């Protein structure tokens, strides 16, 4: 017998109509919740609801879902794969392509050892005490022997995802680097062992060759609950609950700040190409959210000479590769910047470079604030290339006091701006860079300097 059923309610039935609801709940069925005039029922043969763990009408902390969720990240592929938002990593004949008609990204691989990984640059900030929700739409496609497909909220060290393994078996997985030995451990639960709904029969029988909407919500606090399932006909169907308090002796996951990701990995040469599609995804915080980062700033200690008609990277910041022996998975947002010039008018650009290699530096990068920051800075760069201009404008020379710096303080794009952040690359070896550039628009030299104020979020 199916572990769940959905009953269409007559229009005259109200949620508080206990007599009617008790009647349809007889004979081994328990009401979980009502949504859009449908009663979502669970078989009592599979166990009873405990502390709301099966009730999708409450969040991961058991709070009634009445608040508007705060979107931490949202990802679509309507106009292609945006390199400002995604990291693509391939090996062998692994391939990643955009399907403009499907508004999706396709991954494929054929040969042994090949892989294709499509991952957000953003490691989304988890706020303790808030329920975090991830939704991802996809088509895994038919299983291909020797190929593993994954989609969810994860990286190489930690995360939660749906997996189709080399034999075609489906499972929910929690990956963790909490052992402290450098090894990765994984809780893996096959579909036949999902403890709420296996989706193996009944009205909603999971067909992974069709479009699906994967659902995750979790408490972290290092010891909380994780729920996995799917959204079907507007109803969130919880399939498996991982409980960790009073069970594990260590945190279930080392880092809750993670990217959305999908991947294909081949362990053998496959007879046919293995493929999947990733369509759309979002990460949300429930019950309120404040991006409570740590604020730092740097400035040029001395003026730099900007010659006539030239451009100069006045000041730059980037993320360190390693923090306390771990990959640096913080992200940084500029809050404001200032540019000053003493003699001539200049144009300024706040630019985001995709790699440190795009900046020619005259000396080593320096750690900010005696290593309490996850950022390092440079004030001696001489050239730059490529980059995305986030902000631009002009600074006029001070006509009253020529030798007095004339600052222009400019507010920066806010939290909702998808491009106003820098992050590390896939393996935390080459950070994106914020660089403040001055361009001399006149026929005479001038002295320039700059400052940056930013937030570090992790």
Question: How would you describe each model-predicted region?
Answer:
Residues 1-51:
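Terminus-proximal functional modules
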Residues 28-30, 126-140, 287-440, 449-457:
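Beta-rich globular "head" domains
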Residues 41, 272-279, 444-455:
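Edge beta-strands of jelly-roll/beta-sandwich modules across compartments, strongly enriched
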Residues 49-174, 190-192, 244-324, 396, ...:
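Low-complexity, Ser/Thr/Pro/Gly-rich disordered linker/stalk regions
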Residues 145-166, 234-237, 430-432, 438-458:
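C-terminal interaction-tip segments
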Residues 180-213:
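Short, aromatic/His-centered strand-loop micro-motif at the edge of beta-sheets
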Residues 202, 232-255:
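Short, solvent-exposed beta-strand-to-loop segments that form ligand-recognition rims
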Residues 209-225, 231-233:
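Localized edge beta-strand/strand-to-loop motifs within extracellular or lumenal beta-rich domains
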């Amino acid at each position: 017998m199916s572990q769940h059923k959905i009953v269409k309610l007559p229009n005259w039935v109200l949620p508080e109509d206990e007599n009617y609801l008790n009647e349809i709940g007889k004979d081994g069925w328990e009401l979980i919740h009502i949504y859009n005039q449908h009663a979502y029922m669970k078989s009592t043969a599979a166990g009873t609801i405990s502390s709301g763990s099966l009730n999708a009408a409450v969040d991961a902390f058991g709070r009634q879902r009445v608040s508007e969720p705060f979107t931490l990240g949202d990802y679509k592929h309507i106009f292609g794969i945006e390199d400002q938002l995604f990291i693509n990593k391939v090996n062998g004949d692994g391939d990643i392509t955009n399907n403009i008609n499907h508004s999706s990204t396709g991954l494929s691989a054929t040969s042994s050892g090949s892989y294709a990984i499509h991952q957000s640059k953003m490691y989304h900030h988890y706020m303790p005490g808030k329920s975090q929700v991830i939704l991802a739409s996809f088509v895994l496609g038919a299983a291909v022997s020797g190929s593993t497909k994954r989609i969810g909220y994860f990286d190489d060290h930690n995360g939660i995802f749906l997996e189709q393994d080399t034999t075609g078996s489906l499972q929910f997985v929690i990956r963790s680097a909490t052992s402290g030995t450098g090894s990765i451990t994984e809780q893996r639960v096959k579909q036949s062992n999902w403890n709420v709904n296996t989706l193996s029969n009944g009205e909603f029988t999971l067909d992974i060759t069709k479009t699906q909407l994967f659902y995750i919500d979790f408490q972290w606090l290092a010891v909380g609950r994780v729920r996995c399932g799917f959204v079907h006909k507007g109803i969130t169907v919880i399939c498996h609950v991982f409980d960790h308090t009073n069970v594990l002796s260590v945190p279930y996951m080392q880092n809750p700040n993670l990217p959305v990701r999908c991947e294909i990995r081949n362990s053998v040469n496959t007879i046919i190409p293995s493929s999947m599609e990733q369509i759309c995804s979002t990460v949300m915080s429930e019950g309120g959210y404040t991006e409570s980062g740590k604020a730092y700033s740097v400035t040029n200690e001395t003026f730099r000479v900007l010659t006539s008609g030239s451009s100069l990277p006045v000041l730059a910041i980037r993320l360190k590769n390693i923090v306390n022996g771990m990959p640096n998975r913080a992200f940084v947002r500029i809050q404001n910047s200032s540019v000053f010039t003493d003699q001539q008018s200049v144009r300024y650009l706040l630019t985001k470079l995709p790699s440190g290699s795009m900046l020619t530096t005259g000396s080593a990068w320096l750690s900010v604030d005696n290593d309490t920051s996850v950022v390092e800075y440079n004030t001696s760069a001489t050239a730059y290339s490529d980059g995305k201009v986030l902000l631009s404008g002009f600074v006029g020379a001070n006509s009253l006091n020529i030798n007095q710096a004339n600052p222009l303080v400019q507010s920066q794009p806010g939290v909702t701006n998808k491009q106003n952040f820098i992050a590390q690359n896939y393996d935390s070896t080459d950070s994106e860079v914020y660089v403040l550039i001055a361009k001399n628009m006149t026929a005479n030299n001038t002295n320039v300097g700059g400052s940056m104020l930013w937030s570090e979020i992790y």
